[in-house]
Amino acid sequence: MFLLYEYDIFWAFLIISSAIPILAFLISGVLAPIRKGPEKLSSYESGIEPMGDAWLQFRIRYYMFALVFVVFDVETVFLYPWAMSFDVLGVPVFIEAFIFVLILIVGSVYAWRKGALEWS
């Protein structure tokens, strides 16, 4: 039998954890001073007036390196718990982890062939 009163603590937690950020934004919106002027529209660089053009364009290589780093960082996050419990999980989980590593190797070879790992 499905009883809703067993989930009262969950619903209370959900409502409270949703209400706190909403209240924080509402209170800060009401209490914050609203001042408009030229100082509000200017760029802020460590308290000094910006010299030259404040808009900088980054090369796409930075984003490619960041993307490859995130992929391998996530790989480490997923493989570490598996390595710590390898003796308990057995062969089927080893096969799944092997397939996961193969997919990541295919992805890294693809990134390498596309030139995402070259800095020039």
UniProtKB/Swiss-Prot annotation:
Residues passing through the membrane, by range: 9-29, 64-84, 88-108
EC number(s) per entry: 7.1.1.-
Keyword Heme: no
GO MF annotations, alphabetized: NADH dehydrogenase (ubiquinone) activity; quinone binding
Topological category with respect to the lipid bilayer: Multi-pass membrane protein
Signal peptide: none
Domain of life (superkingdom): Eukaryota
Subcellular location: Plastid, Chloroplast thylakoid membrane
Function as written in the Swiss-Prot or TrEMBL entry: NDH shuttles electrons from NAD(P)H:plastoquinone, via FMN and iron-sulfur (Fe-S) centers, to quinones in the photosynthetic chain and possibly in a chloroplast respiratory chain. The immediate electron acceptor for the enzyme in this species is believed to be plastoquinone. Couples the redox reaction to proton translocation, and thus conserves the redox energy in a proton gradient.
PANTHER family: NADH-UBIQUINONE OXIDOREDUCTASE CHAIN 3 (PTHR11058:SF9)
Record's subunit section: NDH is composed of at least 16 different subunits, 5 of which are encoded in the nucleus.
Name of the protein this chain belongs to: NAD(P)H-quinone oxidoreductase subunit 3, chloroplastic
Species annotation: Gossypium hirsutum (Upland cotton)
Classification of source organism: Eukaryota, Viridiplantae, Streptophyta, Embryophyta, Tracheophyta
Underlying gene: ndhC
